[in-house]
Amino acid sequence: MTAIDFHKLAKIELHCHLDGSLSLSTIRHLAELAQIDLPEDDEELKQHVTAPVTCESLLEYLESFDYIRPLLQTNEALTIAAYDVAKQAALENVIYIEVRFAPELSMDKGLTVTETIDAVCQGLRQAQEEFGIIAKALVCGMRQSDQSLTARILDEANQVRDSDFVGFDFAGDELNYGPAAIKPLIEQVKSYNRPMTFHAGECGCPAFLAESIAMGIKRNGHATILAQEPELLDEFVKNGVTGELCLTSNLQTKAAVTVNDFPYLKMKAAGANITINTDNRTVSDTNLTKEYELYHKYFDSTVQDFYAHNKTAIEASFASDEEKEELLARLAKAYS
Protein backbone atom coordinates (compact mmCIF):
# COMPACT_ATOMS: atom_id res chain seq x y z
CA MET A 1 0.00 0.00 0.00
CA THR A 2 1.16 3.52 -0.63
CA ALA A 3 0.92 6.51 1.70
CA ILE A 4 -1.95 7.99 -0.30
CA ASP A 5 -4.05 4.90 0.41
CA PHE A 6 -3.59 5.32 4.16
CA HIS A 7 -4.45 9.00 3.88
CA LYS A 8 -7.67 8.24 2.02
CA LEU A 9 -8.94 5.69 4.53
CA ALA A 10 -11.81 6.94 6.69
CA LYS A 11 -10.69 7.04 10.30
CA ILE A 12 -11.99 7.43 13.85
CA GLU A 13 -9.91 8.82 16.72
CA LEU A 14 -10.83 8.50 20.39
CA HIS A 15 -7.57 9.51 22.13
CA CYS A 16 -6.22 12.92 21.16
CA HIS A 17 -5.04 15.60 23.60
CA LEU A 18 -5.78 19.19 22.61
CA ASP A 19 -2.64 20.78 24.04
CA GLY A 20 -0.39 18.11 22.56
CA SER A 21 -1.77 18.40 19.04
CA LEU A 22 -1.58 22.06 17.95
CA SER A 23 -0.07 22.77 14.55
CA LEU A 24 3.04 24.96 14.49
CA SER A 25 1.15 27.70 12.64
CA THR A 26 -1.53 27.75 15.34
CA ILE A 27 1.10 27.76 18.10
CA ARG A 28 2.61 30.86 16.45
CA HIS A 29 -0.83 32.50 16.15
CA LEU A 30 -1.64 31.83 19.81
CA ALA A 31 1.77 33.10 20.93
CA GLU A 32 1.18 36.32 19.01
CA LEU A 33 -2.20 36.76 20.71
CA ALA A 34 -0.63 36.08 24.12
CA GLN A 35 2.34 38.35 23.33
CA ILE A 36 4.77 35.51 23.99
CA ASP A 37 8.01 35.33 22.03
CA LEU A 38 8.82 32.11 20.18
CA PRO A 39 11.89 30.95 18.24
CA GLU A 40 11.66 32.28 14.68
CA ASP A 41 12.90 29.03 13.17
CA ASP A 42 10.26 26.28 12.87
CA GLU A 43 12.78 23.53 13.53
CA GLU A 44 13.83 25.21 16.76
CA LEU A 45 10.20 25.70 17.78
CA LYS A 46 9.50 22.06 17.00
CA GLN A 47 12.24 21.00 19.41
CA HIS A 48 10.34 22.74 22.22
CA VAL A 49 6.90 21.29 21.45
CA THR A 50 7.85 17.82 20.19
CA ALA A 51 9.18 15.23 22.61
CA PRO A 52 12.41 13.35 21.84
CA VAL A 53 12.02 10.20 19.74
CA THR A 54 12.93 8.30 22.89
CA CYS A 55 12.29 9.86 26.30
CA GLU A 56 13.67 8.75 29.63
CA SER A 57 10.12 8.38 30.92
CA LEU A 58 6.51 9.51 30.57
CA LEU A 59 7.30 12.48 32.80
CA GLU A 60 9.99 13.71 30.37
CA TYR A 61 7.48 13.33 27.54
CA LEU A 62 4.99 15.47 29.47
CA GLU A 63 7.50 18.35 29.73
CA SER A 64 6.68 19.38 26.15
CA PHE A 65 3.22 20.44 27.33
CA ASP A 66 4.63 23.12 29.61
CA TYR A 67 5.50 25.21 26.56
CA ILE A 68 1.88 25.26 25.38
CA ARG A 69 0.08 26.00 28.65
CA PRO A 70 0.58 29.82 28.61
CA LEU A 71 -0.89 29.96 25.10
CA LEU A 72 -4.26 28.47 26.12
CA GLN A 73 -5.50 30.97 28.72
CA THR A 74 -8.33 32.76 26.86
CA ASN A 75 -11.64 31.77 25.30
CA GLU A 76 -10.36 32.85 21.91
CA ALA A 77 -7.21 30.74 22.21
CA LEU A 78 -9.12 27.61 23.20
CA THR A 79 -11.57 28.04 20.34
CA ILE A 80 -8.73 28.51 17.84
CA ALA A 81 -6.91 25.49 19.25
CA ALA A 82 -9.93 23.17 19.15
CA TYR A 83 -10.74 24.22 15.60
CA ASP A 84 -7.13 23.60 14.57
CA VAL A 85 -6.99 20.05 15.94
CA ALA A 86 -10.36 19.05 14.44
CA LYS A 87 -9.33 20.59 11.11
CA GLN A 88 -6.06 18.65 11.07
CA ALA A 89 -8.02 15.46 11.67
CA ALA A 90 -10.63 16.22 9.01
CA LEU A 91 -7.94 16.88 6.41
CA GLU A 92 -6.66 13.31 6.82
CA ASN A 93 -10.15 11.83 6.54
CA VAL A 94 -10.94 11.42 10.21
CA ILE A 95 -14.75 11.44 10.29
CA TYR A 96 -15.10 11.40 14.10
CA ILE A 97 -12.71 12.61 16.80
CA GLU A 98 -12.83 13.05 20.55
CA VAL A 99 -10.49 15.82 21.69
CA ARG A 100 -9.63 15.77 25.39
CA PHE A 101 -8.38 18.66 27.48
CA ALA A 102 -7.94 19.67 31.13
CA PRO A 103 -9.82 22.87 32.09
CA GLU A 104 -7.41 23.28 35.02
CA LEU A 105 -4.53 23.97 32.62
CA SER A 106 -6.39 26.92 31.07
CA MET A 107 -7.54 28.60 34.30
CA ASP A 108 -4.30 30.44 35.16
CA LYS A 109 -5.73 33.85 34.19
CA GLY A 110 -9.25 33.56 35.48
CA LEU A 111 -11.24 31.45 33.03
CA THR A 112 -13.92 29.30 34.64
CA VAL A 113 -14.38 25.60 33.92
CA THR A 114 -17.58 26.35 32.02
CA GLU A 115 -15.88 28.99 29.91
CA THR A 116 -13.11 26.59 28.89
CA ILE A 117 -15.60 23.91 27.85
CA ASP A 118 -17.76 26.40 25.94
CA ALA A 119 -14.70 27.75 24.11
CA VAL A 120 -13.44 24.31 23.10
CA CYS A 121 -16.88 23.19 21.94
CA GLN A 122 -17.22 26.37 19.88
CA GLY A 123 -13.99 25.59 18.04
CA LEU A 124 -15.04 21.99 17.44
CA ARG A 125 -18.41 23.15 16.08
CA GLN A 126 -16.70 25.52 13.66
CA ALA A 127 -14.66 22.63 12.30
CA GLN A 128 -17.75 20.42 12.10
CA GLU A 129 -19.61 23.02 10.07
CA GLU A 130 -16.65 23.63 7.77
CA PHE A 131 -15.33 20.10 7.21
CA GLY A 132 -18.15 17.68 8.00
CA ILE A 133 -16.20 15.92 10.75
CA ILE A 134 -18.03 15.06 13.98
CA ALA A 135 -15.86 16.40 16.81
CA LYS A 136 -16.53 16.03 20.54
CA ALA A 137 -14.81 17.20 23.73
CA LEU A 138 -13.74 15.21 26.78
CA VAL A 139 -12.78 16.87 30.07
CA CYS A 140 -9.70 15.55 31.88
CA GLY A 141 -9.11 15.64 35.59
CA MET A 142 -5.39 15.88 36.37
CA ARG A 143 -4.55 13.01 38.70
CA GLN A 144 -1.55 14.74 40.34
CA SER A 145 -3.49 17.91 41.21
CA ASP A 146 -5.06 18.79 44.55
CA GLN A 147 -8.09 16.52 44.79
CA SER A 148 -10.40 19.18 46.19
CA LEU A 149 -9.59 21.38 43.18
CA THR A 150 -10.18 18.52 40.76
CA ALA A 151 -13.45 17.64 42.48
CA ARG A 152 -14.69 21.22 42.02
CA ILE A 153 -13.61 21.25 38.37
CA LEU A 154 -15.38 17.97 37.66
CA ASP A 155 -18.56 19.14 39.40
CA GLU A 156 -18.65 22.39 37.44
CA ALA A 157 -17.98 20.50 34.22
CA ASN A 158 -20.87 18.18 34.97
CA GLN A 159 -23.22 21.17 35.06
CA VAL A 160 -22.42 21.92 31.41
CA ARG A 161 -25.01 20.53 29.03
CA ASP A 162 -23.56 20.79 25.54
CA SER A 163 -24.06 18.03 22.98
CA ASP A 164 -20.41 18.36 21.95
CA PHE A 165 -19.09 17.76 25.49
CA VAL A 166 -19.53 14.03 25.88
CA GLY A 167 -17.41 12.60 28.69
CA PHE A 168 -14.56 12.55 31.18
CA ASP A 169 -11.01 11.25 31.49
CA PHE A 170 -8.19 11.23 34.04
CA ALA A 171 -4.74 12.09 32.71
CA GLY A 172 -1.31 13.07 34.02
CA ASP A 173 1.08 11.23 36.33
CA GLU A 174 -0.17 7.63 36.38
CA LEU A 175 2.93 6.23 38.11
CA ASN A 176 2.43 8.17 41.35
CA TYR A 177 -1.36 8.51 41.21
CA GLY A 178 -2.92 5.18 40.29
CA PRO A 179 -6.67 4.48 40.37
CA ALA A 180 -6.75 3.72 44.10
CA ALA A 181 -5.13 7.09 44.87
CA ILE A 182 -7.88 8.97 43.05
CA LYS A 183 -10.75 6.57 43.72
CA PRO A 184 -13.01 9.27 45.27
CA LEU A 185 -12.70 11.31 42.06
CA ILE A 186 -13.43 8.29 39.89
CA GLU A 187 -16.52 7.49 41.98
CA GLN A 188 -17.56 11.13 41.70
CA VAL A 189 -17.50 10.96 37.89
CA LYS A 190 -19.28 7.60 37.89
CA SER A 191 -22.08 9.21 39.93
CA TYR A 192 -22.75 11.60 37.04
CA ASN A 193 -23.84 8.71 34.81
CA ARG A 194 -21.82 10.21 31.99
CA PRO A 195 -19.22 8.36 29.91
CA MET A 196 -15.65 8.04 31.18
CA THR A 197 -12.35 6.80 29.81
CA PHE A 198 -9.18 6.40 31.84
CA HIS A 199 -5.42 6.41 31.33
CA ALA A 200 -3.95 3.16 32.71
CA GLY A 201 -1.29 0.62 31.82
CA GLU A 202 1.11 3.21 30.38
CA CYS A 203 3.70 3.19 33.16
CA GLY A 204 4.46 -0.50 33.56
CA CYS A 205 2.00 -1.04 36.42
CA PRO A 206 -0.42 -3.92 35.75
CA ALA A 207 -2.20 -3.33 39.06
CA PHE A 208 -3.41 0.07 37.84
CA LEU A 209 -5.07 -1.39 34.76
CA ALA A 210 -6.53 -4.22 36.85
CA GLU A 211 -7.97 -1.66 39.28
CA SER A 212 -9.55 0.37 36.48
CA ILE A 213 -11.17 -2.78 35.05
CA ALA A 214 -12.43 -3.73 38.53
CA MET A 215 -13.95 -0.25 38.84
CA GLY A 216 -16.03 -0.95 35.74
CA ILE A 217 -14.32 1.53 33.41
CA LYS A 218 -14.99 0.34 29.86
CA ARG A 219 -12.48 2.43 27.90
CA ASN A 220 -8.79 2.50 28.62
CA GLY A 221 -6.12 4.87 27.34
CA HIS A 222 -2.96 2.99 26.32
CA ALA A 223 -3.27 -0.43 28.06
CA THR A 224 0.35 -0.99 27.03
CA ILE A 225 1.08 -3.35 29.92
CA LEU A 226 -1.20 -5.99 28.35
CA ALA A 227 1.74 -7.10 26.19
CA GLN A 228 3.31 -8.62 29.32
CA GLU A 229 0.18 -9.74 31.20
CA PRO A 230 -1.82 -12.58 29.58
CA GLU A 231 -4.14 -13.05 32.57
CA LEU A 232 -4.90 -9.34 32.68
CA LEU A 233 -5.54 -9.42 28.93
CA ASP A 234 -8.10 -12.17 29.54
CA GLU A 235 -9.84 -9.93 32.10
CA PHE A 236 -9.69 -7.00 29.68
CA VAL A 237 -11.43 -9.07 26.99
CA LYS A 238 -13.90 -10.71 29.37
CA ASN A 239 -15.04 -7.30 30.64
CA GLY A 240 -15.45 -5.88 27.13
CA VAL A 241 -13.00 -3.03 27.70
CA THR A 242 -11.86 -1.05 24.66
CA GLY A 243 -8.19 -0.12 24.34
CA GLU A 244 -7.16 3.27 22.97
CA LEU A 245 -3.75 2.29 21.55
CA CYS A 246 -1.09 4.94 20.88
CA LEU A 247 1.94 3.32 19.20
CA THR A 248 4.29 6.23 18.48
CA SER A 249 3.67 7.81 21.87
CA ASN A 250 4.29 4.51 23.70
CA LEU A 251 7.60 4.00 21.91
CA GLN A 252 8.65 7.55 22.81
CA THR A 253 7.84 7.22 26.50
CA LYS A 254 9.26 3.68 26.69
CA ALA A 255 5.88 2.39 27.81
CA ALA A 256 6.78 -0.04 25.02
CA VAL A 257 10.58 -0.26 24.81
CA THR A 258 10.37 -1.85 21.36
CA VAL A 259 7.59 -2.68 18.92
CA ASN A 260 7.64 -6.22 20.34
CA ASP A 261 6.59 -4.78 23.71
CA PHE A 262 3.50 -3.13 22.22
CA PRO A 263 0.29 -5.11 22.94
CA TYR A 264 -1.47 -4.85 19.56
CA LEU A 265 -0.85 -8.35 18.18
CA LYS A 266 -1.58 -10.08 21.48
CA MET A 267 -4.74 -8.03 21.93
CA LYS A 268 -5.82 -8.81 18.38
CA ALA A 269 -5.21 -12.54 18.84
CA ALA A 270 -7.22 -12.47 22.08
CA GLY A 271 -10.17 -10.73 20.42
CA ALA A 272 -9.79 -7.50 22.40
CA ASN A 273 -11.51 -4.27 21.38
CA ILE A 274 -8.80 -2.18 19.67
CA THR A 275 -8.72 1.42 18.46
CA ILE A 276 -5.80 3.29 16.86
CA ASN A 277 -4.94 6.81 18.06
CA THR A 278 -2.30 9.53 17.94
CA ASP A 279 -2.34 10.59 21.62
CA ASN A 280 -0.56 13.88 20.78
CA ARG A 281 -0.14 14.83 17.16
CA THR A 282 2.52 17.49 17.75
CA VAL A 283 4.31 16.19 20.84
CA SER A 284 4.65 12.81 19.08
CA ASP A 285 5.08 14.31 15.58
CA THR A 286 2.42 12.00 14.17
CA ASN A 287 -1.07 11.77 12.71
CA LEU A 288 -3.44 8.87 12.10
CA THR A 289 -2.15 8.36 8.56
CA LYS A 290 1.37 7.84 9.95
CA GLU A 291 0.03 5.53 12.66
CA TYR A 292 -1.76 3.36 10.08
CA GLU A 293 1.43 3.18 8.03
CA LEU A 294 3.30 1.96 11.13
CA TYR A 295 0.68 -0.68 11.95
CA HIS A 296 0.93 -1.95 8.38
CA LYS A 297 4.73 -1.92 8.50
CA TYR A 298 5.19 -3.58 11.89
CA PHE A 299 2.06 -5.73 12.25
CA ASP A 300 0.91 -6.32 8.64
CA SER A 301 -2.41 -4.64 9.45
CA THR A 302 -4.75 -4.69 6.46
CA VAL A 303 -7.51 -2.41 5.23
CA GLN A 304 -9.98 -4.87 6.75
CA ASP A 305 -8.18 -4.58 10.09
CA PHE A 306 -8.47 -0.80 9.95
CA TYR A 307 -12.17 -1.10 9.09
CA ALA A 308 -12.70 -3.41 12.09
CA HIS A 309 -10.79 -1.14 14.47
CA ASN A 310 -12.72 1.90 13.27
CA LYS A 311 -16.04 0.10 13.76
CA THR A 312 -14.90 -0.73 17.28
CA ALA A 313 -14.01 2.92 17.83
CA ILE A 314 -17.46 4.10 16.76
CA GLU A 315 -19.17 1.57 19.00
CA ALA A 316 -16.98 2.59 21.97
CA SER A 317 -17.24 6.31 21.26
CA PHE A 318 -19.23 8.73 23.38
CA ALA A 319 -21.26 9.90 20.38
CA SER A 320 -25.05 9.71 20.49
CA ASP A 321 -26.81 6.62 19.14
CA GLU A 322 -27.95 8.62 16.12
CA GLU A 323 -24.41 9.81 15.43
CA LYS A 324 -23.09 6.26 15.77
CA GLU A 325 -25.59 5.03 13.19
CA GLU A 326 -24.55 7.79 10.81
CA LEU A 327 -20.85 7.10 11.37
CA LEU A 328 -21.20 3.34 10.88
CA ALA A 329 -22.99 3.97 7.59
CA ARG A 330 -20.33 6.44 6.46
CA LEU A 331 -17.59 4.02 7.44
CA ALA A 332 -19.18 1.07 5.64
CA LYS A 333 -19.55 3.14 2.48
CA ALA A 334 -15.95 4.37 2.68
CA TYR A 335 -14.56 0.83 3.03
CA SER A 336 -16.87 -0.85 0.50
UniProtKB/Swiss-Prot annotation:
It catalyses: adenosine + H2O + H(+) = inosine + NH4(+); 2'-deoxyadenosine + H2O + H(+) = 2'-deoxyinosine + NH4(+). It comes from the Bacteria. The active site is at 202 (proton donor). Zn(2+) binds at residues 15, 17, 199, 279. Its cofactor is Zn(2+). NCBIfam families: aden_deam. Catalyzes the hydrolytic deamination of adenosine and 2-deoxyadenosine. This is Adenosine deaminase. It comes from Streptococcus thermophilus (strain ATCC BAA-250 / LMG 18311). Substrate binds at residues 17, 19, 172. Belongs to the metallo-dependent hydrolases superfamily. Adenosine and AMP deaminases family. Adenosine deaminase subfamily. GO terms for molecular function: 2'-deoxyadenosine deaminase activity; adenosine deaminase activity; zinc ion binding. PANTHER family: ADENOSINE DEAMINASE. GO terms for biological process: adenosine catabolic process; hypoxanthine salvage; inosine biosynthetic process; nucleotide metabolic process; purine ribonucleoside monophosphate biosynthetic process. Its EC number is 3.5.4.4. Binds 1 zinc ion per subunit.
